[in-house]
Amino acid sequence: MPLIIVALGILALLFLIMGLKLNTFISLLVVSFGVALALGMPFDKVVSSIEAGIGGTLGHIALIFGLGAMLGKLIADSGGAQRIAMTLVNKFGEKNIQWAVVIASFIIGIALFFEVGLVLLIPIVFAISRELKISILFLGIPMVAALSVTHGFLPPHPGPTAIAGEYGANIGEVLLYGFIVAVPTVLIAGPLFTKFAKKIVPASFAKNGNIASLGTQKTFNLEETPGFGISVFTAMLPIIIMSVATIIDLLQETIGFADNGVLAFIRLIGNASTAMIISLLVAVYTMGIKRNIPVKTVMDSCSTAISQIGMMLLIIGGGGAFKQVLINGGVGDYVADLFKGTALSPIILAWLIAAILRISLGSATVAALSTTGLVIPLLGHSDVNLALVVLATGAGSVIASHVNDAGFWMFKEYFGLSMKETFATWTLLETIISVAGLGFILLLSLVV
């Protein structure tokens, strides 16, 4: 019954947004209230669940999104994004530009959370699409494919790292096998899928105009832009800071030296929000003050960036409310009961449970972590490689992202797509990542 309620809730949401043309945020709130009541949630818990969902989601990403939007806007308004774009175009050529985006996104995706990588790469990818006069989606699909694969499969991302700890898997093996699975999966879900998507939703690839969330884009002569080195450094600084902190953290876990004040300070600096604040302050200097741009002009760019993402943040928060209602309403517990006593292979079972929880709850990390408790009892009676079970759980947890997932709304709003176009691109892309990932994991299980 809970899964039927979830399905009806999703259909109601689609009707409100696509049929009645109701504002997306309002629609999410209305459906969240309705689904909460239908699931039998006590009246005094409904509002608190919705507030917790909005607060929990925005508490995680509001700072990152806000600071990332300002950082991206400064790099774009100074001409730094255009300089990076023009240099990549010149080095790789128009024919190979997709591969440049895939490589850059994969490297960035290893170090950064999905949403951080997205807000940093969007201005650069948009600048490339404008420079070459090609569809933003032609580059956007490979970009998000690389970011999503690294988020689902590779440590030090929270999902794979936490799952490995729960299963007792060797983190080095997870990383090694994760790379083996991730590379072909990105190629299939990125450049190859882009060709297919262009056939099923050609209208979405015709959208080469400005992205509303980035505001009006300026164009520059090459000599007016900052140098390539300083532009890349400014854009990559959050990645550098977080990567250094992560490496030191991993060394501490591996070597086992004691915690101290220095390590605590490094973790503080390496936190995504702290790294973004530091990077933004550096960008104010490198993209503004150093180039004799008045501080007021720089701050105007920051203010514009914030004003342009307000509705996007509310929509993402609304998605978080829907997700929390499903979790608090007991949908996850219902799914757990369905799989008690099953005799399926741990790899397939881990993928299947994570997939159902992902579709039902929306959060990849919640789906992955919830799966571990159901799969762990089966691992004692199996000789399956634990690293592969970790990867299978990660693969299942990214499947079929839809309206209860913040990533769905990020992709839709950033690329200016309709609901139908978002389902045909983003949702299908995430499903391909999940299914292709499982396929490569099963192949790998034959030899390891």
Curated annotation (Swiss-Prot):
A biological process term (GO) from this entry: gluconate transmembrane transport
Location of the protein in the cell: Cell membrane
Membrane topology value: Multi-pass membrane protein
This protein's pathway: Carbohydrate acid metabolism; D-gluconate degradation
A single GO molecular function term of this UniProt record: gluconate transmembrane transporter activity
UniProt superkingdom: Bacteria
Record keywords, A-Z: Cell membrane, Gluconate utilization, Membrane, Sugar transport, Transmembrane, Transmembrane helix, Transport
Keyword Transmembrane: yes
Segments traversing the membrane: 2-22, 23-43, 52-72, 106-126, 134-154, 174-194, 228-248, 269-289, 302-322, 347-367, 373-393, 428-448
CC per GO annotation: plasma membrane
N-terminal signal peptide: none
Pfam families associated with the record: GntP_permease (PF02447)
InterPro entries for the chain: Glcn_transporter
Family of this protein: Belongs to the GntP permease family.
Official protein name in the record: Gluconate permease
Biological source species: Bacillus subtilis (strain 168)
The gene coding this protein: gntP
